[in-house]
Swiss-Prot record:
Ranges for region Disordered: 893-959
Name of this chain's protein: UPF0182 protein KRH_08700
Biased composition (Basic and acidic residues): 947-959
Keywords for the protein's UniProt record, in alphabetical order: Cell membrane, Membrane, Transmembrane, Transmembrane helix
Pfam families per the UniProt record, alphabetical: UPF0182
Any one of the GO CC terms: plasma membrane
Keyword Repeat attached: no
Naturally occurring in which organism (per UniProt): Kocuria rhizophila (strain ATCC 9341 / DSM 348 / NBRC 103217 / DC2201)
Subcellular location: Cell membrane
């Protein structure tokens, strides 16, 4: 460089640009990490606010501390064992000696990062192992808080709590420790290999004393754990379902259980040999012991039990297995609450006679003609009033005392329809709640077939109550979230109810005054919930005031599941007006999967029926259980969302154990009001699980059970085109044979087990009812008869039609078909309602409402006919009374509810399509209603014309179609004229 020259100056861009580029990436990463952490924090923070507002913060804290504690403990145990194994292997590595080039390269690569690897690798594996253990927090909490069952198993005389609480925990613990030891062993083995503690060469494998002691101790610990596993296998035979029957059978008791004990002792002995070998350096004896252990496990644990089963049990299986089958029957019935089922032989007749129903007036007067799965659209058209309201697809059945008499009721809440509301402000601030309960008599309709409401309108009025809180802020169809409260008294923001003819000149508005959700008035809570719901509108809107609350997680099932995560919640909550407020009543279950000798059920499969298939009832989880109790009744206030849990089965050990985990969260049922008690009912999902078990476990004699020749099945729903789904149970008020009075009951029927060909007889074999009426009129006192199961067993020679056969009788009846075809004219649709089965008249009575729905968007079904079946006889009339009389010789002797059917005028209007046809209802059985030959000829002509019309339309021959329609019109006119002449 020449004198006077200056060194080149770096450009400003490069000088300033490189540091900026170098700092940009870490800055971006740091910002992203901070944002992610804050988003995660808001999820936890908003959960804390939600649980705290609801009064169940302890549940949130206890559950999360349990999960976090298990995760940390499991991760640390695995990491500590792996680190200790690595550290010991490195610390006791051989010094000096020959090292192969390959090993030297491994050591040179590992040494610079060895300390990091020895910490990081165990932590990574620990995190993976801990994630599995943490999901089992319920198993751990139940073990440490268990309550005894007070009953012992028939084999080991252990309290049943050992199998339900202790055994699952021990299995979890042993499985975790085995995993941790295997990871530690592999880690130590690799470290010994890399640093020369284990050398592989042509002469074989050589190990240092330190490596032998280290790895031998790990193998010994592994074998000791296997010994514990073998010992626990003895108890696990009582919950095994690997054979024909659940539980320890003859081979298990006499072969498997003894050999498992022998294997446990053998494994311990081999473990001791490995410890000794580690110190003395002689592996021959422990290796022989390990090989012998494998041989014994195969022979004694597999071949010997197989030989006992094949050559001793199979030839005389019934005699040898009888004792153990009886255990299975007894324990299964106990586990599912079937042990107190009252079985009554019922020699049902199929013969009819006049006055046969005179003794069943309490049953016939309560027969429900409104199908809650059909009339939802009728509720919507008659009571929805505005498009932003809706009713559920399936309504609910309850009962109310009206004028001192219990009335079965079809009931629903008028909830918001968020799909019809546009814009954030409207969705979140204005349209915040539904309004009112709508209820109709179950056993009567108006003269034109419409539901006869007992509670309806806006404002809500009726025979149930004129003075209750009608606002539905929490329901099955509520919006995702709403901002409520905080508005000035003179400037409310929430739409309360639409303009009506009751004096409201304009839409009424209101302000929520309850305590229903966390406060979002301060800026931090507002920011947290804006992030949670990804809404900038919430953050910027001036509609969010200092006193505003946010309502979310509003579905009753979801709220109960969150505050009681240990419960399985029934798929169908239902609303009731209780103590002048609307509450959702939610049934919840405690379950277990390791009740000894009890056969397992998969909840989702056992509860599957038409309603779950259609999505009108939530499906239960795909969980395998063998013990269930309806231990909790929960209520969710429809106005403020408050959740109350009541210990319905306060003797359930599983519930009592959970009460130890979450104290003061479940109240005794003695705190339930008389009004609430009156609306508690027997839960559907529990009943469906029980009836599924009764398909086999109605048999209580071991010999008969072994023969397996009396297996039942729940009939498929005959009203559905897809006949491969079970008929749902039905709520009915009726008097069972031998009882003094009618009770609100949940019912189902049984037919013989159906084979794949479908050729099995569809006849009635059994009829199950559960007393679903808990009310006594007193606070905190439930009826002694509530939950009582009664099973009517029909003779196996029964010719009483099952539901499928009864539906076929209805469908194949010529006169019924003719009238149904007439009802279908004018593009009307005929809808068969639920097929109800009732024990009455000394036999089984079938009743099915028939609805007609015209075409068009505003159409809804109305009752038009009632089908009745008894034996082979069918009645079909506008009224229930008329249909019963047709079956029972012209006078059934029954008393039916006022309005149990439609008027003759309405029936004529429906049948003729133009309001003129007055064809009397046919009487295919019993005492027939006389028809003139001219009238019958006209009906036959009409029927033929309809068939010709259908054929012409399918063929696309519109000329013949028009001719057939002309003949049909003339035939209908002739029929009306002839029928008028006979009156």
């Amino acid at each position: 460089m020449t004198a006077g020259s200056t060194s080149p100056r770096p450009s400003a861009r490069s000088a300033s640009g490189r540091p900026k580029r170098g700092a940009l990436l870490p800055t971006v990463i740091a910002v992203v990490v901070l944002i992610a952490l804050f988003v995660g924090f808001t999820q936890v923070y908003t959960n804390i606010l939600w649980f705290e507002q609801l009064g169940y913060l302890r549940v949130f804290i206890t559950r999360n501390l349990a999960v976090i504690g298990l995760f940390v403990a499991a991760a640390l145990i695995v990491a500590a064992l792996m680190f200790l194994s690595l550290w010991l292997a490195h610390r006791h590595r051989p010094r000096g000696g020959e090292v192969t080039d390959t090993m030297r390269k491994y050591q040179q690569a590992l040494d610079p990062v060895r300390k990091v690897v020895m910490v990081a690798v165990p932590l990574i594996f620990g995190l993976f192992a801990a994630s599995t253990v943490a999901t089992q927090w319920q198993t751990v909490m139940l073990f440490f808080n268990q309550e005894p069952f007070g009953q012992t198993d028939p084999q080991f005389s252990m309290d049943l709590g050992f199998y339900v609480f202790t055994l699952p925990f021990l299995r979890l613990l042993i499985g975790f420790l085995v995993t941790a030891l295997l990871l530690a062993g592999v880690a130590g083995l690799l470290m010994h290999y890399v640093y020369g503690g284990i050398r592989i060469h042509e002469r074989g494998i050589t190990t240092t004393r330190a490596a032998r002691v280290h790895l031998g101790s790990i193998v010994a610990a592994f074998l000791a754990l296997q010994a514990v596993n073998f010992w626990l296998d003895r108890y696990s035979t009582l919950i095994s379902s690997s054979g024909k029957w659940t539980g320890a059978m003859y081979t298990d008791v006499n072969a498997v259980i003894p050999t498992k004990g022998i294997l446990a002792v053998a494994a311990l002995l081999v473990a001791v040999l490995f410890v000794v070998a580690g110190f003395i350096g002689r592996w021959k004896l422990p290796l022989i012991g390990a090989a012998m252990l494998v041989v014994v496990a195969v022979v004694a644990g597999g071949l010997y039990p197989w030989a006992i089963q094949r050559f001793q049990v199979t030839p005389t299986e019934q005699a040898l297995e009888k004792e153990f089958i009886q255990r299975n029957i007894t324990m299964t019935r106990q586990a599912y609450g079937l042990d107190d089922t009252q079985v009554t032989p019922y020699d049902a007749t199929t013969e009819t006679e006049k006055g046969a129903l005179r003794q069943d007036t309490e049953t016939t007067s309560n027969i429900r003609l409104l199908d809650p799965n059909v009339v939802s659209s009728a509720f919507a058209q008659l009571q929805q009033f505005r498009p932003y309201y809706q009713f559920p697809e399936m309504l609910n059945v309850d009962r109310y005392d009206i004028d001192g008499q219990s009335q079965d009721t079809v009931i629903a809440t008028r909830e918001l329809n968020p799909d019809q509301i546009q814009g954030w402000y409207n969705q979140s601030v204005v349209y915040t709640h539904g309004y009112g309960v709508v209820a109709a008599y179950g056993s009567r309709v108006q003269s034109d077939g419409k539901p006869q409401f007992m509670q309806a309108g806006i404002p809500s009025k009726g025979e149930i109550s004129d003075d209750y809180e009608p606002r539905i802020y929490f329901g099955e169809k509520s919006p995702n979230y709403s901002i409520v409260g905080g508005a000035a008294e003179d400037a409310p923001l929430e739409l309360d109810r639409p303009q009506t003819n009751e004096g409201d000149a304009e839409d009424a508005k209101t302000t929520f005054t309850g305590n229903g959700g966390p406060n979002v008035g301060n800026w931090f809570n507002k920011l947290a919930y804006s992030i949670k719901f990804q809404s900038t509108d919430m953050l910027l809107s001036d509609a969010v005031r200092p006193e505003s609350q946010i309502l979310y997680d509003r579905n009753p099932r979801e709220r109960v599941e969150k505050v009681a995560p240990y419960l399985t919640v029934d798929g169908k909550p239902y609303p009731a007006i209780v103590d002048n407020k609307v509450v959702w009543i939610v049934d919840a279950y405690t379950t277990a999967a390791s009740y000894p000798y009890s056969s397992p059920s998969v909840l989702q499969d056992a509860t599957k029926d038409t309603q779950t298939a259609q999505g009108t009832t939530a499906a239960l989880p795909n969980e395998r259980v063998n013990y269930i109790r309806n231990s909790v009744k929960a209520t969710v206030n429809a106005y403020d969302g408050s959740v109350e849990l009541y210990a319905w089965d306060d003797q359930d050990p599983v519930l009592k154990s959970w009460q130890n985990v979450f104290p003061s969260t479940v109240k005794p049922y003695s705190e339930m009001s008389a009004d609430l008690m009156a609306h508690v009912r027997y839960p559907e999902d529990m009943f469906k699980v029980q009836r599924e078990l009764l398909n086999r476990y109605h048999v209580t004699d071991a010999n008969s059970f072994y023969a397996n020749d009396d297996v039942w099945s729940v009939p498929n729903d005959p009203t559905q085109q897809n006949r491969n789904v079970s008929q749902p149970p039905y709520y009915l008020s009726m008097r069972m044979p031998g009882e003094k009075e009618a009770n609100f009951s949940l019912t189902s029927s049984f037919i013989p087990q159906q084979n794949e060909s479908g050729n099995t007889r569809n006849v009635m074999y059994g009829y199950l009812s559960a007393n679903a009426d808990a009310g006594t009129g007193k606070d905190g006192v439930k009826s002694e008869n509530y939950g009582k199961l009664r099973l009517l067993e029909l003779p196996r020679s029964s010719v009483v039609p099952g539901p499928g056969q009864a539906q076929n009788l209805f469908n194949s009846d010529t006169d019924v078909s003719q009238e149904l075809n007439l009802l279908r004219q004018g593009a009307s649709e005929v809808i068969n309602g639920n097929l109800l089965t009732l024990p009455a008249g000394g036999g089984m009575l079938y009743v099915q409402p028939v609805y007609v729905q015209s075409s068009g968007d505003a159409a809804y079904p109305t009752l038009r006919r009632v089908l009745v079946g008894f034996g082979e006889k069918v009645g079909f009339a506008p009224t229930l009374d008329g249909a019963l009389d047709e079956v029972f010789g012209g006078n059934s002797g029954a008393k039916t509810d006022t309005g149990a059917g439609v008027s003759e005028k309405a029936a004529e209007a429906a049948q003729g399509g133009k309001g003129k046809d007055s064809t009397p209802s046919p009487s295919p059985s019993g005492t027939p209603v006389p028809r003139s030959s001219s009238l019958q000829e006209a009906l036959d002509t009409a029927n033929k014309a309809m068939q010709d019309s259908d054929k012409a339309m399918k063929d696309g021959d519109w000329t013949k179609y028009g001719e057939a329609q002309d003949r049909l019109k003339r035939a209908i006119d002739d029929a009306m004229a002839q029928d008028g002449a006979t009156k």
